[in-house]
Amino acid sequence: RALPEVRVYMAKGAHSCVAKALEIMGHGSDCVRQIPVNDMSQMDMTALTDAIAEDRENGLAPLAIIGTAGSVGVGAYDDFNALADLAAQESIWMHVDAAFGYWSRLADSPYRELSDGIGRADSIALDTHKWPGVQYDCGACLISDRDLHRSTFSSRPAYLESAASGLAGGDLWFCDYG
């Protein structure tokens, strides 16, 4: 059975890594729909809502909304509460590219408010090398649904045996999360 053609939504000017990731996943970069931005360089919520409705009418499957915390070009933060509300209403995955702007969650006011609602995302990517001087290859992807994350990556082939203790001990193996 063929999978439906998917759509991923992100603001114009969002990081190019999204298109690259979709290429790696086999969806191709053509599934990206760039949404116009408002005067604060945030994804325009009316345009996003209209794009999702239009794509559904055309038989496409909205897969994800990619919010941005600190866009590379202008440092913009999307309205994460509005994105999360729409994602929940439409049953669409909400991811936040917080590679550059995750730090604001740790900051004092007024910078902390830039990332209000970011915790409602289904997943968040961050790169610590962009702020605290950590090595370039240090990054993380946080997934809100532990069970979904585990079931996606968990694999117990016959040659991997459980043990009472040690690295293979217990129910949770390091490899069960990717």
Report residues per predicted region.
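PLP-dependent aminotransferase-class I/II
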Residues: R1-G67, V74-D78, A82, D108-E113
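Active-site-proximal loop/turn and secondary-structure-junction residues that shape catalytic pockets
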Residues: A14, S71, A98-Y102, K130
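Short helix/loop capping segments that flank catalytic or ligand/cofactor-binding pockets
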Residues: V18-K20, C31, G75, W103-S104, ...
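Soluble FAD-dependent oxygen oxidases
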Residues: P62-V74, A87, I92, A164, ...
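Active-site C-terminal subdomain of aminotransferase-like
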Residues: S71, D116-G178
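Catalytic PLP-binding core of fold-type I/II PLP enzymes
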Residues: A76-D108
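Acidic/histidine-rich catalytic neighborhood
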Residues: F100-G101, L106-S123
